[in-house]
Regions:
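Intrinsically disordered, low-complexity regions enriched in acidic/Ser/Thr/Pro/Gln residues
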Residues: 1-93, 97-104, 108-110
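Feature captures the catalytic cores and cofactor-binding loops of soluble hydro-lyases/lyases
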Residues: 5-7, 116-193, 199-202
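Short beta->alpha transition motifs characteristic of CBS
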Residues: 111-115
Length: 204
């Protein structure tokens, strides 16, 4: 293998050559992204640069907003749809809700699954198969709003995320950077807006 550098260990009075594949490994480590989902997944790519570029190019981010009454309607819809959870528990739910002006917040697609990432990926697949754009859409999940959830929704082009659960610090930081509104602890008439509150109309 081609030699790219030499390292000297003074204590042992020895040196060794660093082959090219180790240099490539170090380059990959420089691009490492550690996410905050289950098990802290690690991605070795320029993922964040791609996500930022995607978010900036999506017009759906620019005007996205939601009213307080619409948040309440989405929460009520979610409670009524979770048949498997109410029967047996042990599953997560994700939904894509209509956020067009004058809509009732009805669910365009709803899925329950033992894995929250399986559920969000099902939403992504449905949008692709049905040629559904991200405009006037709300994403709802029962799972935590982690960095992975924020990244996936940014790639979908959805700027408003609701969750029955809370958020993580990295999820919050990414949402702040990308312009995504995170709304957590959605139960009954209660919710907490964690990021970009300017996207929420609290008067209607």
């Amino acid at each position: 293998a081609a030699v790219t550098s030499r390292t000297l260990a003074l204590a042992g009075e020895s040196w060794w050559e660093q082959p090219e594949h180790l240099a490539r490994f170090e380059a990959r480590m420089d691009r490492k992204t550690v996410t905050t989902g289950c098990g802290q997944g690690t991605i070795y790519s320029d993922l964040m640069a791609t996500v930022r570029s995607d978010a900036e190019s999506l017009g759906s981010f620019n005007e996205a907003s939601i009213s307080k009454s619409q948040i309440h309607r989405v929460i009520a819809q979610a409670r009524n749809h979770q048949a498997v959870y109410q029967e047996a528990g042990g599953v997560h739910a994700c939904a894509l809700a209509d956020n067009k002006p004058g809509s009732d917040g009805g669910f365009l697609y709803f899925v329950e699954d033992v894995g929250r990432h399986n559920a969000v990926d099902a939403i992504t697949g449905w949008m692709s198969m049905e040629a559904q754009g991200p405009e006037d859409k709300i994403f709802y999940t029962t799972g935590r709003l982690t960095s992975e959830m924020v990244i996936k929704c940014a790639q979908m082009g959805i700027a408003i995320l609701l969750s029955r659960s809370g958020i993580t610090a990295m999820g919050y930081e990414l949402a702040q950077e990308l312009g995504i509104c995170l709304i957590g602890r959605c139960q009954g008439k209660h919710f907490l807006v964690y990021s970009h509150p300017e996207r929420v109309d609290f008067e209607s």
